[in-house]
């Protein structure tokens, strides 16, 4: 089967048990040139066929290349799409991993068709991201210092085992024991050498936009270690800008970082050709920063970016604490509260504010150190025990946290905060305050309230309905291509459900 420069793309989506085809022309000249047949060898598979197979497989939640190969041999729909050619899984994997530039053109072509059908309203674009794991191990993350320490530990362990093995050479050991010891020494040496080789290839640590240190990863150094509500993952953040009219994804990017603040401006710049002067951009508090708001104002972009205190200022949510459910203990990642002190507290001492005296639980009077001592911004009276009373006291263990090192007890009775001068009020005319003022208006709340219903169902469709919940490739270039494929499946489904006008 020869390759064609123009593909009549078949959009297959399952709706009510039926497969609905939609057709339009997409130029695949670049993809054809890259997969052109050689003068020798077997004919190349047409990229049009491979793209149809991969896209339909993704729409069914089939992402692994071996699984796609299997259904091409066993499933009648895939057999029809591939023309009974049943491409090998290595061919499918190579096609997907080298598809970024080509799939970007297909994504743009499908977006143009959606625009021609009136599915892009340009009234509001909601920007958000989803953190997905990738084909990388989070256990192989660390800084150069941590990798160096691991290599030294492995080398030390290998040396210790080798010395022990040499010391027992004269003994009559079981052959299996000697073979296992030799294999373990070789494995430790190999792992240490792999770390040394990686350190030689990567002489510098990863740095963030502000110069902060970021952990590298030896399986995929472009990925990032990110915290989610389900735990820590090693992967990428898939960012999408979704139009509010029909939930069409108008821009899709993938980045190896969990910091959303640095992902806003790349999406805004990519939307410059698509949005109008009246298009509203919305994003949640993860994208809020003074630098981002200043950049949006400089670009004259109309946007509503939530700040972390937006809900606290909303009077409609004044009684939100009453409706808060108990936290799930399995997902509570906060640090446990420190245990209650087992020593005597100031309430256990007898304090006379008028006489300015203090008596400890053992009945001994304490010396007053001052009437206006300041501790952490609080003013009060401080008392100190006498050494002749505290050292031989029988209640010493119940009075001092470290009786073996502390000689006497100190206690303070605070009266209130130290009066300070009023802090200067922040400037009123800043990008942050202006954004807050817009968000706090009824119109701003109504506009921003549409963000959640616009972008979150898109991620739900991709992750749960389509089961496209992880990246199977390594390297940002390949992951961007796969994320575009994920978003392309969503857009084609939206287009098919909306109907195709003549």
Q: Where is each model-derived feature located?
A:
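Serine-centered coil/turn micro-motif
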Residues: 2, 10-16, 393, 441
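Basic, short loop/linker segments at the boundary and entry of helix-turn-helix/winged-helix-like folds
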Residues: 8-55
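Aromatic-lined, polymer-binding surfaces characteristic
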Residues: 79
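Short, flexible loop/hinge motifs at secondary-structure junctions
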Residues: 1-7, 311, 320
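Short, solvent-exposed coil/turn linker segments
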Residues: 6, 24-27, 143, 345
